[in-house]
């Protein structure tokens, strides 16, 4: 199947190609998804470890059980994104948020 991911700000094609599924396509291209429009995407159980999601639009995306270890989510739009409570620490780290105690 053919897939494409567009840039969130300009609607230009960021990446296009073929894969068996959208999940597989995203995993194969996770190295540079900065400014990607992934709004409303079902990314549950997707391996996004080390993904560059800087300024990506992940609003309303399903990120439950996605592996976000060492991902860069800085300045990403996560409005109404769905995650599991067990992912909260990974998300905080990926957003580069420092918790002060």
What is each of the regions a protein language model found here?
Residues 35, 39-70, 75:
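Periodic short-repeat tracts
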Residues 1-36, 54, 69-70, 74-101:
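Intrinsic low-complexity/IDR segments
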